[in-house]
Amino acid sequence: MMKALIALSRLIDAVNEHVGRAVYWLVLAAVLVSAVNAMMRYTFNLSSNAWLELQWYLFAAVFLLCAGHTLLHNEHIRIDVLSSRFTRRTQVWIDVFGTMFFLLPMAFIIMWMSWPIFMNAFHSNEVSSNAGDLVRWPARLLIPVGFFLLSAQGISELIKRIGFLMGMIPDTLEKHQDPALEALADEATK
């Protein structure tokens, strides 16, 4: 059973890795939209709320769709002041507890509560109240999709932590850095 769960975890990891890498390009798109908007506004005195809202949509996509990717790479903000004093097994148990009782319930609740908002916007073909009339449902869809990716990655991380505690897989959180990078980091701190 655990081998099948570990395979599922690897599949979830691969999906979030691919989504994250694809969404990186939206940062460039947001920068380009912002630059074109500023250039049009200051050069030709043309301004459009649609361009500003498009920037907002792109930023929302980056923020929401990369949450699972960020969790995959253990880059979410956490307070390590206390946990750094614990053994690795204790840290893993804290991660299991936090994932089961905080991350997953919160992500499931947000998914569940945001789905009707998306459906309402989709069925009513809701548009922006600002000039430009961008449809709102794509931005509303980002919320449940982003939290689905985050909760799936949370399940993957839970599987990996339990696999580690059972001795079935190595610690996936160990940082394996390039020795040259470690030497540079050591030199920089001197």
List the predicted regions and their residue ranges.
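Alpha-helical transmembrane segments and membrane-interface helix-loop junctions
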Residues: M1-K190
